Structure formats: C-alpha cells, structure tokens
Amino acid sequence: MSNTKWIGAAAGWFFGGPIGGIIGYYVAKNFFGSKVDNKKAFEISLLILSSIVIKADGKVLKSELDYVKKFFTNTFGATKSNEYFRMFNSLNKQDLTSKLRQVCLQLNSHINHSSRLEIIHFLFGVSASDNEIHPKEIEQIKRIATYMNINP
C-alpha cells in the first residue's frame, strides 16, 4: 500500500493539479477505490485554505480547529466531518503555503464568484474564532482573495 498512495498522488497531480495530488494521496492511503469528484475536491480545498490561515500567525489553537470541525459537521454531517477532520489533522502537519496559489486558481476555475466570497467569509470566521484576527492571517486571506479574483 505504501507505493499506492504515491501513485495516487502522482495520478491526482497529473489530472487535477495540486488539489488532485493531495486528494489522490489520501484516497489511495485511506479510501482506496473511492471516487473523488469536484465536490470532494472543493471540501478538501476548504481544509487546505483553513490550515494555511490557521497557521499564519504561528499558532494552532483549539478554538480555530473547533471552528473548522463545527463548520464541517454542520455542513457535511458528522460522519463525513470526522473523515475530513482526520485528513485535516494530517494536512495541518504540512507546510502548504507553497501550494496556495495553485489551490486558489484551481478553485477559481470551478466555482462562481459568490461561492468564492463565501470561502473568504468562512476564512475570516476561522481567523476570528480565537478572538483575535492576526495581521498575518489577514495577509493570507487577502492573498487567497487576490488569487481567487476577489478585490481584497
């Protein structure tokens, strides 16, 4: 199985860019045989962007993690939320900032403007969940907005 996850990552990257690579890796590692669709790619993109914003100030706080988990539970249900949060915990151990632009551009090509605005709103909620909107978090959210063709 150890080679399978890397083959999945390579195939995912080839067909779906950086998001596809991450999805391919996790599908092969955890959900071998599962089919990944645009909805799942969107949901994983939210996790990636959340992780980047959470880590922007150099601290990962429980309140921020709880905010993301609650959002996913309310939006996608408890079972799916638990599945995604296991993935989120793994993503949080990685430095994903180098993939930020590619993830945003890929999202930009698949969702409409109002959905992109909702993502920015969600990310500000993540940032504010610890009762402090750190300037570095704002900087990351502005960068995300710019990459998604939203005037910051």
What is the predicted role of each segment?
Residues 1-152:
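Small-residue-enriched hydrophobic alpha-helices in membranes
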